[in-house]
């Protein structure tokens, strides 16, 4: 079965991951987010309890 022979496919996989890690990823990490996170504390509201009709 040729699927079990990793010789041609392992090198393709390694080259693909190296390309992703060394060339594409640093370019993607330089982009800034459109909405940076703020340092304000979030307003947490306490939910009102549900009035169950059978209690």
UniProtKB/Swiss-Prot annotation:
Please indicate if the UniProt record lists Ion transport as a keyword: yes
Localization, UniProt: Mitochondrion membrane
Q: Which residue ranges does the record annotate as region Disordered?
A: 35-55
Q: Name one GO molecular function term.
A: proton transmembrane transporter activity
User: What membrane topology term does the record carry?
Assistant: Single-pass membrane protein
Q: Where are the transmembrane segments?
A: 8-24
UniProt keywords (A-Z) are: ATP synthesis, CF(0), Hydrogen ion transport, Ion transport, Membrane, Mitochondrion, Transmembrane, Transmembrane helix, Transport
An annotated GO BP: proton motive force-driven ATP synthesis
Q: Which domain of life is it from?
A: Eukaryota
Q: Does the keyword Signal apply?
A: no
Q: Which GO terms describe its cellular component?
A: mitochondrial membrane; proton-transporting ATP synthase complex
The family annotation for this protein states:
Belongs to the ATPase protein 8 family.
Q: Could you describe the subunit structure of this protein? A: Component of the ATP synthase complex composed at least of ATP5F1A/subunit alpha, ATP5F1B/subunit beta, ATP5MC1/subunit c (homooctomer), MT-ATP6/subunit a, MT-ATP8/subunit 8, ATP5ME/subunit e, ATP5MF/subunit f, ATP5MG/subunit g, ATP5MK/subunit k, ATP5MJ/subunit j, ATP5F1C/subunit gamma, ATP5F1D/subunit delta, ATP5F1E/subunit epsilon, ATP5PF/subunit F6, ATP5PB/subunit b, ATP5PD/subunit d, ATP5PO/subunit OSCP.
What does the function comment of this entry state? Subunit 8, of the mitochondrial membrane ATP synthase complex (F(1)F(0) ATP synthase or Complex V) that produces ATP from ADP in the presence of a proton gradient across the membrane which is generated by electron transport complexes of the respiratory chain. ATP synthase complex consist of a soluble F(1) head domain - the catalytic core - and a membrane F(1) domain - the membrane proton channel. These two domains are linked by a central stalk rotating inside the F(1) region and a stationary peripheral stalk.
Q: Could you identify this protein by its name? A: ATP synthase F(0) complex subunit 8
